Each structure stands twice: as C-alpha cells, then as structure tokens.
Amino acid sequence: MVAVAAAAATEARLRGSTTATAAPAGRKGRQHRPCTATGAWRPGPRARLCLPRVLSRALPPPPLLPLLFSLLLLPLPREAEAAAVAAAVSGSAAAEAKECDRPCVNGGRCNPGTGQCVCPTGWVGEQCQHCGGRFRLTGSSGFVTDGPGNYKYKTKCTWLIEGQPNRIMRLRFNHFATECSWDHLYVYDGDSIYAPLIAAFSGLIVPERDGNETAPEVTVTSGYALLHFFSDAAYNLTGFNITYNFDMCPNNCSGRGECKSSNSSSAVECECSENWKGESCDIPHCTDNCGFPHRGICNASDTRGCSCFPHWQGPGCSIPVPANQSFWTREEYSDLKLPRASHKAVVNGNIMWVVGGYMFNHSDYSMVLAYDLTSREWLPLNHSVNSVVVRYGHSLALHKDKIYMYGGKIDSTGNVTNELRVFHIHNESWVLLTPKAKDQYAVVGHSAHIVTLASGRVVMLVIFGHCPLYGYISVVQEYDLEKNTWSILHTQGALVQGGYGHSSVYDDRTKALYVHGGYKAFSANKYRLADDLYRYDVDTQMWTILKDSRFFRYLHTAVIVSGTMLVFGGNTHNDTSMSHGAKCFSSDFMAYDIACDRWSVLPRPELHHDVNRFGHSAVLYNSTMYVFGGFNSLLLSDVLVFTSEQCDAHRSEAACVAAGPGIRCLWDTQSSRCTSWELATEEQAEKLKSECFSKRTLDHDRCDQHTDCYSCTANTNDCHWCNDHCVPVNHSCTEGQISIAKYESCPKDNPMYYCNKKTSCRSCALDQNCQWEPRNQECIALPENICGNGWHLVGNSCLKITTAKENYDNAKLSCRNHNAFLASLTSQKKVEFVLKQLRLMQSSQSMSKLTLTPWVGLRKINVSYWCWEDMSPFTNSLLQWMPSEPSDAGFCGILSEPSTRGLKAATCINPLNGSVCERPANHSAKQCRTPCALRTACGECTSSSSECMWCSNMKQCVDSNAYVASFPFGQCMEWYTMSSCPPENCSGYCTCSHCLEQPGCGWCTDPSNTGKGKCIEGSYKGPVKMPSQASAGNVYPQPLLNSSMCLEDSRYNWSFIHCPACQCNGHSKCINQSICEKCEDLTTGKHCETCISGFYGDPTNGGKCQPCKCNGHASLCNTNTGKCFCTTKGVKGDECQLCEVENRYQGNPLKGTCYYTLLIDYQFTFSLSQEDDRYYTAINFVATPDEQNRDLDMFINASKNFNLNITWATSFPAGTQTGEEVPVVSKTNIKEYKDSFSNEKFDFRNHPNITFFVYVSNFTWPIKIQIAFSQHSNFMDLVQFFVTFFSCFLSLLLVAAVVWKIKQSCWASRRREQLLREMQQMASRPFASVNVALETDEEPPDLIGGSIKTVPKPIALEPCFGNKAAVLSVFVRLPRGLGGIPPPGQSGLAVASALVDISQQMPIVYKEKSGAVRNRKQQPPAQPGTCI
C-alpha cells in the first residue's frame, strides 16, 4: 500500500511538473483568463478529411529516432520518482492498472491509474500524436514533424533548432501538406520570429520526381532556425516531415554528384558529375557536348556551358534558328535584392524593368530592377530609384520611355493606395502625378494598359482589382494621359465580374483586352477562383464573354505570341471545406487561340527544378516569354525563358497550318511562306475565323450560368434570353416567352441584372436602384414601382421629367399635383440621371422634333444670389452656366444643353418644353457599416459579425472574402473573428503558458521563487526591444536584443522554450522546485491560480483577490468575474442589486430585499429545482388583504424543512423603507404552517394598505414550496343568497323557454317538409284508365253480352311491401232518385278503398274471344281479397 501511495504521489508530481512547464497551444473550446484571448473560427463550411492516396506522407523515421527525439525534449525525472513509478507498476497496483486503448507515441507513456497517455512537453492528444507547444532541438541532425496522421485543428507549434553561430544548416522538406493560404509553417534564420523570414510554406508540396530532386530545401546561415506552425479551424491535412542537417550538401547534390569536404574550410560541397554544374549539381552543362563541332562548343568557364554557333540555339545547341519547336531554359541568380513576388515588369527596348514587389526582408531591397534581355544580366541603377515607398500588387504600363505605376499595397502600412507615379527611364527618377479629378478607386491586384483609341486619345485603362472600401471592382477606370483626369467608364455588353490577381493582355490586332481568371467574390460570403475569359473592345467599350479555360487560378501571368495568349503558373487552390489536391503553386502552361476561341494545354517546363509558382511576372521580347520571380513558399529570383516555335521555320503549307498549339501561323499563298498572326492580312484573318467557326464546339451547359440578358447575349457560346433565364440557341423559349438573341435588344439599365454583381455595401449604395441586404450579405434590386409609374428612384428621391409646355409657375403647380416640387439638382447622381434621361428622350423617334429645355427648381433670389427650391445655394460645380449666362432678364433656371451640363436663365412667365419634378422616396437607404479596412482595433473589427477578420501580427482588419487577397504570401500569422481578440502585445498575457503560446513572446521570472514574472517580446537569447518607426529612422525598424529587461545577474530567469517549474503566481514559495508550499493572499489551487471562496479576481502573476460585493444577499461569487450567486429568490444582478420585476418581485435589495407579490385567494407553487436555483436559501412574499371586513387566512408547506418569519406593517413602503414591521410569527425547522389574521385585531378598516411579509429561509436546494392567502365570509348573507338564487332560477327559466321555442320551430319546419314530400310522392304514383259499365233499367238487355251481375271487380289494386296486403279501390254506386238519376248536387258514384289480404288470392286469367266484341269469361267463384 505504501508503494501504491508513493506511486500516486509521484504521478501527481509528474503531472504537475508537466503542466507547469509545458507551453501547449490553444485548443478548440479552451477558455483563457480575461487578460488573454483565443483565436476564432474561420467563416464558411468546414469538414475534416484525409488526403488522397497520391499525397500520402513519407514513411516515419525509424523507431530509434522518436526515442532519441523525446529524450532531447524531456528532462529526465528524478531517480526517486523513477523508482517509485517502477515500484508502482510492478507492485500490488499492477492488479488495478489500466491499459491505454491506443499506444502512446512521441515519448508519451500510459498512466496505469487512469488508462490515459501522459504526454511529454510539447505534445498533446489522446495518444500524444499532435504537436502543441515549443521544442528545442540541439542535435547536429534530426527531424521536425507535427506528428503521425493529420495535424490538429487550431494549433500552434514552434521548433528551435540550435546549432553553432554562423554554421550553415539545411532543412529538407520531404513531405508537406497543409491547407493552402491558411495553414503556414514559417522558417526564420535565427532564434525568434524577429529574425529574417526566409520561407512561408503552405499547401501541397510533394516531390514530382522519383529521384526526389525537386523537394524544397531551405538554407539557414545563422546557426539557429525557428520554425513556427499555425493551423486554423478549417480542414486539416497530413502535415509535414522535415529533416535538418548541419553538414549536408545542398539538395544532396541532386543525385548528380558527391558531397565532399571543402579544402578551404570545414564546409562540404558538391563535386558534380559530367554535364552538370551548379551549387547542387542542378544545372545541365554542355549536354550532348553542345553538338560539337557542328552546332556549338562547350565553354567550361561559362555557367551556361554551351556557346552555340550561328543558326543554333537551345539546350545543347540542338534547336535551329528560327526555332521549329518551343523550349524552356532557366537562368538562376543569387543576388539578395532580387527575390520578390507580386511585382510588375515591362519591356522597353531590350531592357526588362521590374518595379516593386513583396519581399520577406527589406535590408537589401531595391524598388526598381533592370534586366538586359540580350546579355541576360542585371544592370546597376542609381539609388534614386528607391525613393518610392515599397509596394506590391500594383500595375505598370509603358508609354514613350515612361513607366506609369498605379495603386498597389504599401508594404510598410498595409494600406492600398491610389497614387499614380511615373518613372522616367532616361534619368531613373520618379514623379508623383496629381490628376485633376480624383474619381478613381484605390485598388490592388489589378492590371493596366496604355492604348491609343480610334479617336486618337491615349489613355491608361485600369482593369478590376480589389478595393478595401468597395470590395472587388468590376469597372474599368480610365486615365487620360493628356488631360491628366480620371473617369470610370460606362461599359456595354456582358456584366463581367471583377476580381483580384487576374491576367490581362492587349492585342493590337483586335484592339481588345483579354482578361483571364482571378480571385473573385460572387457575393459577400461566396468567393472562389475563376476560369473566366473576357474580351474588352477598347473603342466600343464592349465586354464579351469568351470560352473559359476550365483551369481556375489567380496571380498567374499571360502574354500574346502570334495570335495566341500564353498563360503560365498561378495559385490553383480552390478548396474551402476539403482538399481535392489543388496545389498552391502551379506550373500549368496553357494557350488560348484568339482567332478560334479555343484553349489548349501545353507541356510543363522540364528543367530539373521545381518551377511551380504564383505572383511572378511575364514579358514578351522577340517572341520569347521571360518569367521572373514569384512565390512557392520561398521568394524566387530566377528567370524562366520560353522560346516558342517560329512560323518562318516552316517551309510547307501543311507544316505551317499544323504549327502549334502555342502559336498561330498562316500560309501566304502569294509569297509561299509561313507568316505569323500579326503579319496576316484581313482576308487571311477572316478566312481563318470562318474556318474555326465551322469547326467550333459549343458548351450549351454554360448558358445556364448567365443570370442576365446582357451576359447571355454577349458571349461566344450562342445563347439567347427567354424572359428570365438563358438557354442555348438550339432550345426554343416556352410559349409566352420572348426570345432575345442580340445584346442590343436587351432591356437597358435593369437593376435585377447588375445589382447582384456588387459585393460590398458601399459599392451597392453607389447605385440608386440597389439596396444592401445585411442579413444575407448581398446586393438586391429595389422594387420597380417604389416611386410609381413614370418616376425613377435616384438616391433618396423620385424624379420625373415631363414634356408639357408651360411656364415656371404652372410647371411648379403640375409637380405639386403629384406631391412633388421642381427638382433641386444638388447631387452628382441627380445630375447624371437627368442628363442621361434627357439624351435618351431627345434621341427617341417620338420626340425627335421636340427640343426639351426643362425647368428645374433654380431661382434668383436677389441681384446675384441663385438658390434651389430646397433653399440650398447654387454652386457652379455640378452644372455650369452657359456663356454669357445668367442673363439679367431671367429669374428662373432651365437646362439648355444636356450634353454640356449647361444652364440658362429664362423669363419665368415664358412657356417652355419640359420640367423636372422631384419628391422624397418612400424608401430610405440603409446605412452601411464602417468598412473593415477602416477599423483600427480588434474589438471594433470583430464586434459586429463575421464579415471582418483581424490579423493580430499585421494589426489589420480585412473583409472575410478578401483574406486571401490581403495576405497572399502568408503575412498573417494568426487571425480572429466574432468578438475574440488577443492582447495587443506580449505584456497582456498573465501566465507563462499563455505567454509561450505566442511565437514572439518569452517569460521573464522574477527572483522571488514564487512563479511571478512578466511576458515580454523576445528570442531564445533574451528579451528584445521593439523600436518605433520614428526612433528607428527607417521604414522597416528591426527589434534589438535587450538583456537588461531580464538580467540574469539580478537572479531573473528568461524562459523561451518551457515555463519554469515553479508556477505559484507570486502567492507562495516553491518547495522541491515545483510544489507551492502554502497559497497566501486569499488564493487557492495547485498553482495558487484562483481566489478562495467568497473572493474574486485574477490572482495569476501576482494579481489580487477582493471580497465579493453582493449587498448582503450572497456570500459566494464567481472567483474570476465576481458575479454574485444571490441566495434570495427574486434578487438578481452581478452584485445582487436588482429585483426580478418582470417576475412580480418588488423591493429594494440595496436597503432590504425582494418580495414576490401574492394574490388573495390564489395558491402559488414555487419549484426551485433547476441548476440555476442551487444557491437559493431564502424567498420572501408579500400580501395585502382585499376585503376590510374579512379575516385573512394563510397556509404554507414545503418539501423540506425551513424557517418562517411573518411580520406586518401599515403599508408596503412602511415595512421595506422605514422598517416599521411588527413580528407576528417566528418558526424554525418546519415543513407546514397555517394561520388566520383577524380583521378586527389588525384593524383592516383603519389600515387599508396593511401588508403582511412572509420570510422563508434556511432551506436547501432543491425544494418545492406552496403558499396561499385567502379571505372567506363567516356567516351566510341571506339577501345575497336569495338574489343569487332567483337570478339563477329566472335565467334557467328563460333559457328553457328559448330552447322550447326553438324546438317547436324546428318541429313545425320538419312537419311541413314531411307533408310536402308526401304530396310529391302521391303525385308521382302510377295511373291508368279503366272502363266502367253502368247498368240502367232502360237499357236493352241485348246490348251487353253475358251477365254483368257478378262479383264487383276493383278499379285499382296497390300492393304493399311484401305482397301480402294491398289497398283495394272500387266504385260504389250511391242511392239514386227516380229514373236512376242522383239527387241534384250529389254524385252517383264514389270510390271506396280498403286494406285487404292478398296472400291467398288466386290469379285471374283473362282471355279474348274471337270476334269484334270482347266479353269477360266467367271465373271460378273466388273473392278478390279479404279485408283486414
């Protein structure tokens, strides 16, 4: 048993030591102290997944390596503790030991007491399978991994590799797979994140060759390397496996040489095999001996190797001049000022000018570079080229030895600029232009081209881009070089969607721009890459949608070679919730045939190097494409050269026509030679287009993607518009729908088409017909009839232009008839709308003969003062007076020249054609929230919703749909959303564990041996001082090591990898280095990290605890926030300072308590059983009698014992405010109580507001309480009884009479209906005629044959149901007078009927005798029936 206890104690100490010294990363759901904050989830759908098999990670290291690795990371336990653990495992506790369900990895061990893995410092997870802290590696070689399997969501891990100063270290990335653009591994050449950044790895980086020669490798020269990994809350992948070595040749000599020690130093270097050169033997050298002696000669001193003879070129001088096939070459340069991305380049003569770009470090930065394309060398430039602040994502355009640079993101501030600067090539100087009208968007990720229009004007067209204030821009901005003015063009054709990082080229033959791809937002919360291809005609300002490439990408490049647009590289990652293998960095090579509207995929470069990249530049010189720089986790400085095949290399028509893809050649029959697309005649070009048109294949499924008439009819896929949807041209519209096949036939300015193209609130608000819907984060069209028929919504006003001829006063009266007034054109929107409408009305056929000069609400008030109808003064900015205007004769204003915005002063009584009316709109435009880019603090950025994201290290707030566009190169190390913000700097973290979660922070422990310390920005060597820009004197200040902030001589201790063992937060001394001896200062806990019961505060790092402030209604409160756990039901508030008025509690808890108001003659039940009720020990009630002449009875019972006190006062305020309560009852430890309060004893009549107070206390949770107050009469009130009795009796009688009357009416109605049915039934009986022979005494006996004096026969026999009875009817002769005549007024005959039995009746047979006279034959004597 002793061994078991010792083992348990040792285990507890080990766990405590691990907890105290570890620096685990923040995890999902973890709650930090108030002084810290955790990251938030990224918006959007997320799902966990595994990488496809083709991306399976490399094999794990041998079993010995993890063991050695864990030994390097973990301090060995003391021998006594190790012995105790061994005794515990092998002793009697072994019978109760639990085995872990899964094996522990990375040095973790199974705790036999809990069956869970105990992880070493830096590892987390059920199996210790995830990294989650900081590691320090000191071996001369080793590996870095996030652990087996997929890495953990929302994690931060840091590795410090420590070597010898200035010793070269190489990191080799054998396997790497993270979420592109979101999960990054940063590599610093030093011992902190303040050291130079040399790589930011993200995405899928898998060697593409069996020889593993293209695996990324990073070289560190300082002797230290810091690797920091951050993953967000989206999906996770297999992570990484990185090996490092201090004595290793670069890239293992690429497998083409041997690694040998250098003679001059202890370093190693490659001894390359034949035909290979370079530091890592990765440059082909004199392949095929350069074709000597026919094609070239090998030059051993030249790194390129071959010196080709005339008419030969390419690798090994194997390709003739002109080239009959395309080929790639690569030029590598090591100058530190060269690597960059998102720069721009133009060609002037034979010089490629490279301007701007993003760089990791700016110590050797150069704003402008010049590259000689002939000699392929970088040229020196004057220092004046660096006078401009560094930027990236800008645009460049060349015109007459001047380079125009517009927009871009300023790297030092993170702001997007709208500066327009010109670089003069001849003197290498910059000039800032100040355009007259600053009506342009500040954009980044756009493109620009300077073109000469058909009118002769030279303009710079700026295409798309992203603006932090207005989102993704879909318009074309135009800068007039001669007028020095900006304007936003109103384009025609398809409604295109603008984006960030597209490519664009200008084709001089077609006078059009071709724009491909980009990162686009289709609404505020829907964003992705695009594969669209647009054509923009610069003269007609017409957009056309061409065939898409089916290859989604952004930050790629494009050039035009002989009628073909070549597209190279880019970021192709388009996954948001799971990985489909799309790579961050691409070397895809595609060609688009302009004449045939056809895409082709070209072979990727075969250069023995990983040439995948994005953010590079590409220019064209002598039909050769030069690709420079870019980003592939590293910033690149090489130049890729693509030489395309030449048309004039083909000698036959068949070879000429078959050339490509990647080039368009035409056969000239007159000269019998092959010419390029640029030299073709118009007839040859049209012939080629017609041939392509006949062979084209249409993708009818693409028609469904167009949601507006303009895009449906302005594309090359043969679609037509059917009322509200787009269908292929071979599909007919349904009945009743109108087919529109041409763009010109589409209804113009329909807001239903273009509003949903706007991706931000501000861009939506610019259009008066659109409205931003904040809930769905989308722009919608306003209803068409919001202003009424004939009226148009412009801003917050409704405008209407009439054509009636009338004077000013009559025009004003006509407007008033519509609750309007003459328009005050005081805004740009109103002016542009009125002028546009006037031009349309004037150009229409119905009004071609009528000249409109409409009245506007502008009048002269005095000699020189003009003002609008809304009393605002007239300014000459939006509308101008015509020459020699205003004249003295006119006092009212008219629009005379809509094309020139001209005004005239006219005589008010003269009738003129037209007037402009204005009235307020019923619609009020919703105000947009502050744009994310203008929010300067994290709390402001993340407070409202998930539309903004805060980047903590960059101190920037960006739109959620623009995160990738804002930080394309991993600049943001951690982001936050939805009201989760970190401290502004390291000093805001109160504990060592939280401090070391931040990669730029370290912990300085004071000498008190209590665990108290402070979090400071620092490195492994010690604290650093963060300089301000003003004191540093440059744009990019660097932190400096400052050991005085944590002096070891003063017994301060600096911790950067692990926290100190003593973590008592300054409230206790440590014994055995890690155990808190006795927590003082009202603290408790293993590390004295919480306040004792009844006190609250943050005692971490020396914080204070203070008593709970509960106004006497609680003794306990939340130890962190101080929120009181109120003990009286009905009292609420953080300090128990309020009553639950909404639940019928009243009172003043600051001076007394709260009472529940009871109603008389009602029973109340209170069930205090919820978790929120666990702290209640008391509840109070108050009741006031309703009747002054009746006694008040009360009873109370409960499910548990309680104490009861009852008092009374003359009124409620008298009892609660002045304390005039009189005790009545005091009981303890009871479950039930009943009592009655006499109205005479307590004098209810003289105390009409008498109040009884009931105090129930000292009960335990849970409990159920029932209470009631009632007032009942003591004797019978006879008058009241009889009044009540007779009232009820008479009421009952009245009800009975009414019911009887209703019954009678119903019965009479039913009787009438029954009689009517009987009459109808009798009327519908069958009938027939009978012959009746009447005998008279005078008749001769021979007239009737036979004897008629027989038994009478019936005239009718009506059988009853069952045929056993019948109604028999016979004629009866009544008595007659003399002569056989009945008396006057009487009938001689009567019909008699009787009910007879016919069950025994025999049938009567009738026979006919031959002859003309019928006679009835004598029948056997039988009765026809018997009466019943």
UniProtKB/Swiss-Prot annotation:
Lineage of origin: Eukaryota, Metazoa, Chordata, Craniata, Vertebrata
Function description: Involved in the initial immune cell clustering during inflammatory response and may regulate chemotactic activity of chemokines. May play a role in melanocortin signaling pathways that regulate energy homeostasis and hair color. Low-affinity receptor for agouti. Has a critical role in normal myelination in the central nervous system.
Domain EGF-like: 100-128
Propeptide: 23-82
Mod. after translation: Heavily glycosylated.
Subunit structure and binding partners: Monomer and homotrimer.
Signal sequence coordinates: 1-22
Protein name according to UniProt: Attractin
Domain Laminin EGF-like: 1062-1107, 1108-1156
Region (Disordered): 15-38
